Amino acid sequence: MSDSDSDASIEPPTQGFADSTLTATEPPPNPLMESLKQEIDLFDKLYGKQRGFSETHGKEISRAERKREGYISTTLTYGEIKFETFAELMNILKGRHGAMKEDGGVFVDIGCGIGKPLFGAALLHKFDKIVGIEILEDLYKVCVETMQHWTRHVKPVLGEERTQDMQFSFLNNDFLIADWSDADIVFMNSTCFNRSLMIDLSAKGKALAPGTIVVTTTKRMVGPAFDLVEELQMEESWGDATVYIQKRVERS
């Protein structure tokens, strides 16, 4: 989408409204975002200008490695979700689908890139374990480096009680090989995954316990092992995408 200039002018206010202000274009306050000011600030410490990161940092790293190694599969195309959007998604999972009612649980990101959903999840809920699986080594290395920034800049703010029992695991591996069967919530930015890969992921996902929530973008898990419980539109790094929320059910 490109920006365009408008030549339209605003008429001066009519008599009797000289003191009125134009507020129609101002977005209303978002109560959720207002309550997450600290988390937004901490996320920016991990992925913002303080580390020299641009909004396209992960995409640039991914593109450079794929070009260097000669990887041509479109399933490796990079995409990520914004923190504010991810926070809204996690709030929906908690409010509508029974997730994260108590501390604990395991969060897994399939194809985690530079780790934004991983550390976003850690800021939003006290998980027992957070697992990121990423096959591109350079992206995986950023996750490991970000863990150092988490320890140095985020843990002291959140406090020992909030973070001491939280374990992080970063796997530089193929997510069809790695074990993620203990997940309570699985997230995957699957917009660029092809149907064959989604079929394989769905087969792999049968190892998940019934009740496990699986969140995907654009493409959803296939087969009777997963029930669709909600479909919505959310903002991704490249624009709006369909988000599917599914639950693992006992039938296979």
Give a label for each model feature.
Residues 117, 138-139:
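Conserved short alpha-helix immediately C-terminal to the canonical SAM/SAH-binding motif I
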Residues 116-127:
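Conserved SAM-binding loop of SAM-dependent methyltransferases across substrates and taxa
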Residues 193-251:
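C-terminal substrate-binding/active-site "lid" region of AdoMet-derived donor-dependent transferases
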Residues 181-196:
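A short SAM/SAH-binding and catalytic strip from SAM-dependent methyltransferases
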Residues 103-113:
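Conserved class I S-adenosyl-L-methionine
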